[in-house]
Amino acid sequence: MTEADSSATPLARGVEVIAQVVATLPLSPGVYRMLSGKGDVLYVGKAKSLKKRVVAYTRPDRMPLRIQRMIAETASMEVVTTRTEVEALLLESNLIKSLGPRYNILLKDDKTFPHILITADHDWPQVLKHRGARNRKGEYFGPFASAGAVNQTLAALQRAFLLRSCSDSVFASRTRPCLLFQIKRCSAPCVERIDRDEYLALVEEARAFLSGQSRRVQHDLTARMESAAEAMEYEAAAVFRDRIRALTRIQAHQDINPAEVEEADVVALHQAGDGVCIQVFFFRSGCNYGNRAYFPVHAQGEEAPQIMAAFLGQFYADKTPPREILLSLEPDEVAIVAQALSEKAGRKVTLSVPKRGDRKRLVEHAHDNARDALGRRMAESGAQRKLLEGVAELFGMESAPERIEVYDNSHIQGSDAVGAMIVAGPDGLMKSAYRKFNIRSTDLTPGDDFGMMREVLTRRFARAQKEDPDRDRGLWPDLALIDGGRGQLNAALGVLAELGIDDVMLVGIAKGPDRNAGRERFFLAGKEPISLESRHPVLYFLQRLRDEAHRFAIGTHRARRSKGLVQSTLDALPGIGPKRKKALLHHFGSARAVAEAGLPDLESVEGISHAMAKKIHDYFHPEG
């Protein structure tokens, strides 16, 4: 590729780069990437015909200002051809999600959703809440919009199907039923108060209910209740009655719960000014599993159908779509989007904009929620902007900070020490940008808070220098708040000086003489401490940020400490890997029971040879 004319304007140079690429492009479908001079991905797009689509960028006067800026920054392009337009759409969605290009419409707050898991790696399956990678063997049901929705459903499932929720190690160690059996929340399979075939039948009923066959399950239970009543088995009939009530209670707690919709997502978009909100409601098994609001970024100047198409592609990039998606408006290239989602799901996925009935009412309800959420967001954003302007005035900054980072440490006499960083900006807390730092230094004295802060800031800003040297990726703070007084501030200033950073404002925030809130003092380099009156809104705002950093640090420390506590004495045994450890815990129920076991008992464990059993026994009984 020849270099663009260096004397031309940036926009003209970008157009020239794109024009040179257009000459080499085929008419086939594919995905293209616009790259900056540093190789950063600016934009990812897909096309039915690469040549016809990319040539449009050589006429930037017809493009939104955002895309014109992207063209001006384009120094090169990368192109991948695909067999079909559907394949191009799937690749585009995955690339946007993984790369986060600066000029694409982005779904920034796409957190993982909790699911319900029925395990399949134990003779007596367990039902539990699950979030994260699906590493455990079993069947997953969801998504649920919140942990609360999962907990509510799990409670009903326990009442209706009496399935165990305890861990495998607890299950193996039980000698008598637990409290859940007494209050009719479990059938006590741990001590075989129920036949295994009967228990597995309950598991199948729960699986059917969660798979969308709720009405069939309830109908079967009703028939069995009536049959028991006719046979004058009133105690059995009462049990079936209670199980039916538990299942109907799930639906009774829903705000909106249509009879016709078994498995669907309802997606509604509301646009006002430069703001966009997309509400997603999840319906599974005829139940409302809750909803979440999304606020796509870089959507200014885009039409609603384009935003909807971009959202659907990214939202389902790492999720299995339901059989039906109800929409408030038709996305761009709806047939291609539907085909792509169907290929991803391995079955037909229907996209529709309902015109009447329950489905239309569901979409209207979701749209009302999207409108209200966007209104609240815009009001909060205006208030947040005023607070940030107040922060700038308080600390003598030239403009309101776009990114504030707050740092705190947590430890117990130096053990399991962690550092924490939280981030806030014009849209509030940016939880996806939070970071935790396990303190690695081995030469720190216990409780050396200054040394811990130096390590945290050194790692944080050295990485920023490496990953965003030109500071155009939004990774650098305008203001860094340090939880502590003059000493912590000086430690932080020393770190930045060593790294050659002199344009990030550092402020220490310390509680008053009696460590009481409302008398905080703010420490700046070379200045006397600043105080605000106890009811000042900027003080309240900064207190909230400090408290959020403290909460995050404490939570991170507790998680690390708990992880250390659960490591049993089996971890110190030579020759005992994860598989043997699991077999021992599964057989005996606890590390203490393993330590107290005799040699014949150890030999009876699957995967433990006579030699290994003797080694384990000798380890715990060195006296013989």
From Swiss-Prot:
Recorded GO CC terms: cytoplasm; excinuclease repair complex
GO biological process: one example: nucleotide-excision repair
Sequence ranges assigned to domain UVR in this UniProt record: 215-250
Listed GO MF terms: DNA binding; excinuclease ABC activity
InterPro entries according to UniProt: GIY-YIG_endonuc (IPR000305), GIY-YIG_endonuc_sf (IPR035901), GIY-YIG_UvrC_Cho (IPR047296), Hlx-hairpin-Hlx_DNA-bd_motif (IPR003583), RuvA_2-like (IPR010994), UVR_dom (IPR001943), UVR_dom_sf (IPR036876), UvrABC_protein_C (IPR050066)
Domain GIY-YIG: 27-105
Annotated Pfam families: GIY-YIG, HHH_5, UVR, UvrC_RNaseH, UvrC_RNaseH_dom
Superkingdom of origin: Bacteria
PROSITE patterns membership: GIY_YIG, UVR, UVRC
Subunit structure: Interacts with UvrB in an incision complex.
NCBIfam families in the cross-refs: PRK00558.1-5, uvrC
Family according to the record: Belongs to the UvrC family.
The protein's name: UvrABC system protein C
Phylogenetic placement of the source organism: Bacteria, Pseudomonadati, Pseudomonadota, Alphaproteobacteria, Rhodospirillales
Record gene name: uvrC
